[in-house]
Amino acid sequence: MLGQLQDAGNTTTISNYLNLLDECGLLASLSKYAGDEARTRASVPKFQVYNSALMNAYNPLRFKAARTDTKEWGRLFESAVGAHLVNGADKGNYEVFYWREGNEEVDYIIKKDGKLVAIEVKSGRRSTNSGLSRFRETF
């Protein structure tokens, strides 16, 4: 991540801005779950809004149009689940991560008391969970 931030400008400034957005309850920065602290810290973050209404306020699609667009609806649904998870992390005393390896991913990884729960969000009936299988094999 630092390499990407250096290309964008001062890493300390960007890091401070991201921290301020997190402290204000606007944007959480989820680390990639990697199994060890060094690889987790070096990962590119996945950004998650604390309130999905902020995302929807700037969405040009109205509810009915978004609901019929399966890709857009899936994105909104995943964001709503993520918002719920990051908002509950402090009270639930857990950490929220994501995981991705190549084309396989798991939307959210919950870590509490050394135990992991992998969550793949699907808004429709069709489901491919190769990411869950790969995550289970790896960790």
PLM region descriptions:
Residues 1-116:
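Accessory nucleic acid-recognition modules appended to NTPase machines
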Residues 123-139:
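Catalytic cores of nucleic-acid endonucleases
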